Amino acid sequence: MKDTFVEKVDDFVKQHDVLKNDSTIVVGVSGGPDSLALLYYLLEKRAEKQLEIVVAHVDHMFRGDESYEDLQFVQGLCEELGIICETIRINVSQYQQQYGMNAQVAARECRYAFLERIMKKYDARYVALGHHGDDQVETILMRLVRGSTPKGYAGIAVKRPFHNGYLIRPLLGVTKEEIVDYCNKLNLMPRIDPSNKKEVYTRNRLRKYVLPHLKEENPQMHEKFQKFSVQMQEDEAYLQELAFEKMNKVITKKSDKQISLSIPAFESMSMPLQRRGIQLILNYLYEYKIPSSLSSIHIDKLIEFFKRTQPSGSLDFPGDLKIVRSYEECSFRFKQEIVSPFSQDLLVPGTITLLNGDKFVTEVSEDIPSNMNETVFVAKYNDISYPLRIRSRENGDRMSIQGMNGTKKIKAIFIEAKVPKEKREEWPVVCDASGTIIWVPLLKRSAFAISKEMAKKDKYMIIHYKSKESSGRIMK
């Protein structure tokens, strides 16, 4: 065991490949003992590692004059040390109210946005923060007590991608006690945030009542928690890659704000991959800003939702995310306003894009397309009256079906195809100038349609349809 604080941090930094030589580092300094210990450690290594150091401080304006005095303290210290200091005052309470989030999440968003800006300004490779071994223990315990994702249970990462570089935490290998001793040896007078002692916060209660007992059992227990954290992160990285690969085979449709998946294909995955697959979808749709009110309880409810025997149903998630099951498909999408009836003329040849993003392209040709799939409609040009009209469905709509006698209700076509009710109102119907329905894209062609086998040399009207939804890969 190393005797000195600096040697212990050196070993930890080397073991986890935390810091490269000849780098610019933005150091988050609150003025408290943790961040001061981090700053002075980096200053001690500055010449040896050829480091450029920039200090960044955020006044969240939670504590009025007291927090402003913290800012002035950091500014004065940096002036004495001759290092660059970037500070900002942010009314986090106002930001919190504006975006409807809790104070801690709001403060974190504001703080990280500022750190990213300073990192970019100085072309820094790293942002360094002062989290230590006790913080790691508290974080893991708190997430185990409250519930979290597998990634969350792994605790605080030593090093992770951030902006164009990395966010690093070199002090995770040392305890709070060791940090305080280091500050005392350097005769530092750190600022103390009184909120760190308020027992209304779970973390503070764990710090006061739980950690002392754990340290009695094993004074080096923070090292065990850190080892657990690293192993969990390594396992999680592998499982995430596997889940990503599997989910891209399960997803049937994808757009910016919606994802649909095949329930049977999803349920064929192992439970660990199902949980991570759901997390991938949520990260994609929420754009990695998952509401703090969303927890593992929601994931459990969703998995149970998939197992239900009822063919339809829905769940509401935080942030207006709605999950709708329809037969063997489940869609994740943000709540939308009721779709208004629509109707647009389509010239031949011509192109239109509907308000929902669906696109129709028409052409006239003596040859029919080689790819006659469900997105293409072909009819003899002279059999159709023009202009065409693209509209939403109407009560009582019927059409003649290619290869069948009589007519069939559009409603029945939707039901047979298991089209979810909420999608039927925006599903386009193609009519000719007389109002006769000639095509329901992706579902049924009318008796006017020409198949590839029937085609002879003639003048044809061809419609190509492209839905706003696409099958595709989810982003990591």
Swiss-Prot record:
It is an enzyme of class 6 (ligase). Keywords: ATP-binding, Cytoplasm, Ligase, Nucleotide-binding, tRNA processing. ATP binds at residues 30-35. It comes from the Bacteria. It catalyses: cytidine(34) in tRNA(Ile2) + L-lysine + ATP = lysidine(34) in tRNA(Ile2) + AMP + diphosphate + H(+). It holds the Pfam family ATP_bind_3. SMART domains: TilS_C (SM00977). InterPro entries: Lysidine-tRNA-synth_C, Rossmann-like_a/b/a_fold, TilS/TtcA_N, tRNA_Ile_lys_synt, tRNA_Ile_lys_synt_N, tRNA_Ile_lys_synt_subst-bd. GO terms for molecular function: ATP binding; tRNA(Ile)-lysidine synthase activity. GO terms for biological process: tRNA modification. The keyword Repressor does not apply. The keyword Ligase applies. One of its GO terms (cellular component) is cytoplasm. CDD domains: TilS_N. Ligates lysine onto the cytidine present at position 34 of the AUA codon-specific tRNA(Ile) that contains the anticodon CAU, in an ATP-dependent manner. Cytidine is converted to lysidine, thus changing the amino acid specificity of the tRNA from methionine to isoleucine. Belongs to the tRNA(Ile)-lysidine synthase family. The N-terminal region contains the highly conserved SGGXDS motif, predicted to be a P-loop motif involved in ATP binding. This is tRNA(Ile)-lysidine synthase. It comes from Bacillus cereus (strain ATCC 14579 / DSM 31 / CCUG 7414 / JCM 2152 / NBRC 15305 / NCIMB 9373 / NCTC 2599 / NRRL B-3711).
